[in-house]
Structures are given as structure tokens and as C-alpha cells.
Amino acid sequence: VLSPADKTNVKGTWSKIGNHSAEYGAEALERMFINFPSTKTYFSHFDLGHGSAQIKGHGKKVADALTKAVGHIDNLPDALSELSDLHAHKLRVDPVNFKLLSHCLLVTLALHLPADFTPSVHASLDKFLASVSTVLTSKYR
């Protein structure tokens, strides 16, 4: 459960990402594909080369979904319901991949926002991304 301090940390950090959210989303995806090659199976139709338009496009989708989640941090299940349905029923993404992408996103944010990425912010973002992952996998049952 996200505490009030966690919510403040998440919102504050996300506001600092600003216009870079799509860029950071794409970078996190690239990082995931490089470090966890098994995740590529869901993207066999993508050009997975560095800087590909498809990775940038999907990075933007990831970033937009997270921006929506931050904006609805008190009601993640409703905010992410359609996305949860998509990943569970149509795409059938292995739930572990959400954890892998979350890890890669944390690394990306730590690299780009080193002064802001304090231990408490790291913990808050980790809890937030775990909450998002839980919602996205809730309809797998």
C-alpha cells in the first residue's frame, strides 16, 4: 500500500520527467530487451534495433500508461482496467515481464535523475511500479 509520502515521492519524481517520459520509456524497453532477451518474444514483429520507431512508439505507450497511473494513484484498478484486460486476455504477456520492465525503468530513472533518486524515492517508485504490475496482472485469473 502506498503511503502519503510514497504518493508525494511518485508524483514529484514523475513531474520532473516531463517531456522525457516517452524517451525514458523507450530506453527502459531497450534495456529490458538487452538484459532479459526472453522478453523479445512478445515483440517479434518489432524492429528491436537501438532507436527504432517501434520501440519509441511502445515506450511512449508505456510512459503514457504510467502517467495515467500517477494521475489516478488512488484508484489504479479503474485507471488501468482496459490495459489489464489487453495484457491478460489478448496479448497474454507473462506477468514476470512487468517486474523486469519495472526494474529497467527504475535503472533508467536513476541514471537520468541521480540527484532526485534518493533511497526513499527509489522505494516509493518501486512500490508504485509493483502496484501497477499487480493491477496489470489482476485479470490473469
From Swiss-Prot:
The modification N6-succinyllysine is found at residues 7, 11, 16, 40. Keywords: Acetylation, Heme, Iron, Metal-binding, Oxygen transport, Phosphoprotein, Transport. Red blood cells. The keyword Disulfide bond does not apply. O2 binds at residue 58. Pfam families: Globin. The modification Phosphotyrosine is found at residue 24. The modification Phosphothreonine is found at residues 8, 108, 134, 137. GO terms for biological process: hydrogen peroxide catabolic process. GO terms for cellular component: blood microparticle; haptoglobin-hemoglobin complex; hemoglobin complex. Residues 1-141 form the Globin domain. The modification Phosphoserine is found at residues 3, 102, 124, 131, 138. Belongs to the globin family. Heterotetramer of two alpha chains and two beta chains. Involved in oxygen transport from the lung to the various peripheral tissues. PANTHER family: HEMOGLOBIN FAMILY MEMBER, HEMOGLOBIN SUBUNIT ALPHA. This is Hemoglobin subunit alpha. It comes from Tursiops truncatus (Atlantic bottle-nosed dolphin).
